[in-house]
Amino acid sequence: MEHAPLPLKDVFHLSPPRDRPSLAFPLGLGDAGLHEICEASHGDFAAMTGFALAARAHRKGPIVWIRQAGLKQSHGLLLQAGYREISTNISPCLTITPRKLSETLWATEEAIRSGVAALVIAELEDTDFTASRRLALAAGRHGVPVLLLMPYSRDGATAASARWRISPRPSSPNRYDPKAPGALCWKAVLERSRQAPHMAGQSFDLELDDETLSLRVVSGLAADPVATRPSWAQDRIGPSHLRQSA
């Protein structure tokens, strides 16, 4: 007995293609998953905060900002005036200041699981692989992007999608007044990347677009190796209008 061949479309049911994370800058930062953003040197915390706010994807909904008390004393608080100068989307922001690292990690995970936050930002003194994995799994499960802001001493293994190392750069020339400061600029080094490991060590020269308040790459992708960070660090002057002393 002969059987007529079945069309392939009746045999195989192809699933729709899954969205893959973009391999272009900033690799999904603030849009999906867990990203670490770290100082390149001591004193870069204000510049690092500005980078995080400018580079993040703009999602509707409140931000939960968790700040470990020790970092609040060392690096100050976020100024709303500076926030408005660097971001077009001024979302409602709930600030939490736990005292201990363990409390900060717990609050971060609870914020992810709350179902309320569109973005969770946590300032931590440090973390380990196990804690970062818990946060990464929670971020993926609940679809909430997470940014961890950490000092220059951060090192070691991580479960984050990427680790960025941020330093300020001299502002670009002001086209209206050559004696006045121009747009804010940063250097961002992709120190680690799970979705694009071949890009680890690449650096981006970035500038804040004053009209759109978004970051643009001004010199393309450079194949600079990650510089070895010294045990001591030279103080830098970041965008001082962004944070104030506690």
Features from the language model and the residues they span:
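Solvent-exposed alpha-helices and their adjacent loops that cap or buttress functional pockets
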Residues: 29, 112-113, 140, 156, ...
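C-terminal functional extensions of proteins
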Residues: 170-246
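A contiguous pocket-lining binding segment that forms or flanks enzyme active sites
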Residues: 118-177
